[in-house]
Regions:
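Carboxylate- and glycine-rich phosphate/diphosphate-binding segment that chelates Mg2+/Mn2+
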Residues: 147-255
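Glycine-rich phosphate/pyrophosphate-binding beta-alpha loops
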Residues: 139, 246-279, 356-360
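Glycine/threonine-rich beta-strand-loop-alpha-helix active-site module
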Residues: 69-176
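Short glycine/serine/threonine-rich phosphate/pyrophosphate-binding segments
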Residues: 18-21, 40-44, 68-71, 93-98, ...
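Short, amphipathic C-terminal "tail helix"
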Residues: 343-382
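ATP/NTP phosphate-donor binding region
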Residues: 1-85
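Gly/Pro-rich interdomain helix-loop hinge
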Residues: 270-345, 381
Length: 382
């Protein structure tokens, strides 16, 4: 057995822990860039804590998924405002943007020199500005991942900037920040976290540490996600879901993902659709295809996922597709066709998905025909 494992240098978890933010970064300097989502007012409490610690903050808002222009503009703000460190405060998009801005500040050349797929893919050699990730949703786990996803709408693709040096110095997870999130966002982001846990659990790169995280994370997400959606003001389920999302990020950063995210990358680039909803619409069909094609010795892992989801030690992998489809129905997840995907898109999506980095860790190597069949099944069910 041989594996490597890494995560953020420091993880702080707990309701109310946001108040520590000023003292955590004060030694790095007295000027910080806050990268947040569309509504900068959501960062008002964060800014108050920084003010109390004597840290001056500058806010840079990201409207949706970051693009090359987003990172370039944010980098210019860092230079113009002489910021010493960076906070990513929001969902996956804000945290990824903050991550990319922090790392690119110290690199030579342009961001395209370091991007996968459409760039030169040069390795990142220098540590970036100190970076703290603060999630306000329970979904992507970007607070503990080593990559930032950037969208290129003009090409209809998403690509990653990736390096171990991009792991945050601190991941500060305050579940109380997710209280009151709208139903749709809670459901979509939560299903993304659940998908990440399931894919990492059966990944070809899984190891004993990611196995342990996935086992507990799946149990937490299965028990708490619906309660978060239908009882949005209760802190207990929010804490469990935040922990599940954290585990999902650590697991995917060390074990990889699979075909669901392999498909989701090109679909997200080609269509304006919530990432978590795309993953949820694909998950039952990828699960079924993987289950049909795995080797007998792989079956135990799939059964253990079923046991975590159903909360039943006798559950088997064959029950998972129905369970996931039922959950998606209750959480009002739109089917793939309703998200804009049609049969005419299948060949191109499958072609792009086959090249996606997430596909490499799928437990089964599906050929082009199998990938197209999975997509067609998802569309027909829609």
């Amino acid at each position: 057995m041989h594996f490597e494992f890494s995560t953020a240098s420091r993880i702080i978890f707990g309701s109310g822990c946001l108040e520590q933010i000023g003292t955590l970064g004060r030694d790095w300097g007295r000027r910080v860039l806050i990268v947040t989502g569309r509504d900068p007012e959501r960062a008002s409490a964060l800014r108050e804590h920084l003010d109390e610690a004597g840290v001056t903050s500058v806010v840079y808002s990201v409207a949706g998924e970051p693009t090359l222009q987003t990172i370039e503009e944010g980098s210019e703000v860092v230079r113009a405002e002489a910021c010493d460190w960076v906070i990513g405060f929001g969902g996956g998009s804000a945290m990824d943007a903050g991550k990319a801005i922090a790392i690119m500040h110290t690199q030579e050349g342009e961001i395209l020199d370091y991007l996968e797929v459409i760039g030169k893919g040069r390795p990142i050699r220098r540590e970036g500005l100190p970076y703290i990730a603060v999630p306000t949703t329970s979904g992507t786990g970007a607070e503990v991942t080593r990559n930032a996803v950037l969208g290129f709408p003009e090409h209809g693709i998403k690509v990653s900037l990736r390096s171990p040096l991009m792991l945050p110095r601190v991941a500060l997870v305050d579940p109380s920040l997710t209280l009151g999130l709208p139903f749709e966002i809670t459901a979509s982001t939560g299903l993304d976290a659940l998908t990440q846990l399931i894919e990492a659990a059966v990944s070809s790169r899984a190891n004993p540490m990611t196995d342990a995280l996935c086992e507990k994370g799946i149990q937490l997400a299965a028990a708490s996600l619906e309660r978060c959606c239908f009882q949005p003001g209760e802190i207990g389920p929010r804490e469990d879901m935040a922990l599940a999302a954290l585990y999902s990020g650590i697991a995917l950063a060390n074990a990889g993902l699979g075909a669901v995210h392999g498909f989701a990358a090109p679909i997200g680039g080609m269509f304006s659709a919530p990432h978590g909803a795309v993953c949820a619409a694909l998950l039952p069909h990828v699960w079924r295809a993987n289950l049909k094609a795995i080797q007998p010795q792989q079956k135990g892992k799939f059964d253990r996922v079923a046991q975590g989801l159903l909360g039943d030690a006798s559950a088997r992998a064959e029950q998972v597709q129905d369970w996931i489809e039922g959950l998606c129905l209750r959480l009002r997840i739109r089917p793939l066709a309703a998200l804009g995907v049609s049969a005419s898109d299948v060949t191109e999506i499958a072609r792009r998905a086959a090249q996606a980095s997430s596909m490499k860790a799928n437990p089964v190597n599906h050929g082009p025909a199998a990938l197209e069949a999975i997509l067609m099944e998802a569309i027909r069910v829609s």
